[in-house]
Amino acid sequence: KVNYCKIKCLKGGVHTACKYGTSTKPNCGKMVVKAYGLTEAEKQEILKVHNDFRQKVAKGLETRGNPGPQPPAKNMNNLVWNDELANIAQVWASQCNYGHDTCKDTEKYPVGQNIAKRSTTAALFDSPGKLVKMWENEVKDFNPNIEWSKNNLKKTGHYTQMVWAKTKEIGCGSVKYVKDEWYTHYLVCNYGPSGNFRNEKLYEKK
């Protein structure tokens, strides 16, 4: 069993699974939690949206950008699901506190993160695939002709993590809650090894 309190994160701070423990039970105050965690089908959907998009970019079929198209890649692998990443992501999602947690690395590697939430009054929750598409759509603001890190990462940083070539694994956590008649789906995806290292390449261009 991993002692998360002993993990030293690249960015410092106390590990999420030490600070909150490893229980994924929601801690959401006045929000009425309708569901937490992901079904097998939802996990597969998240993986499929990521890998379809990674292959689309790798093949040079992504025409969007500022300017587009995005150049093809020669080292883009498919991501695989990692339960440890998912559990740590779920501990954080279950705090219902929208934002990034500081320390979520594993013994194996530093960990990156994408977050999204969507709220609707339509008494239903958006699918996780819809939330992942929000990250994908940031490609429209991405300029491939300058160094990737010179882009505005507030606008494009989820996209760059999604297609970061050296990332191999993903695990996500989710909470669906209701507050004041708003139905909110909050999704946290953790990636290992982390992307968005300024001195490394997004991917090898073909």
UniProtKB/Swiss-Prot annotation:
GO cellular component entries: extracellular region
Gene3D superfamilies noted in UniProt: CAP
Highest taxon of the lineage: Eukaryota
Domain SCP: 47-191
CDD domains: CAP_euk
Pfam families: CAP
UniProt cross-references to InterPro entries, sorted A to Z: Allrgn_V5/Tpx1_CS, CAP_dom, CAP_sf, CRISP-related, V5_allergen-like
Disulfide bridge positions per record: C5-C18, C9-C103, C28-C96, C172-C189
Keywords (A to Z) from UniProt: Allergen, Disulfide bond, Secreted
Tissue distribution: Expressed by the venom gland.
UniProt keyword Disulfide bond present: yes
Compartment list: Secreted
PANTHER family xrefs: CYSTEINE-RICH SECRETORY PROTEIN-RELATED (PTHR10334)
Protein family according to the UniProt entry: Belongs to the CRISP family. Venom allergen 5-like subfamily.
The protein's name: Venom allergen 5
Upper classification of the organism: Eukaryota, Metazoa, Ecdysozoa, Arthropoda, Hexapoda
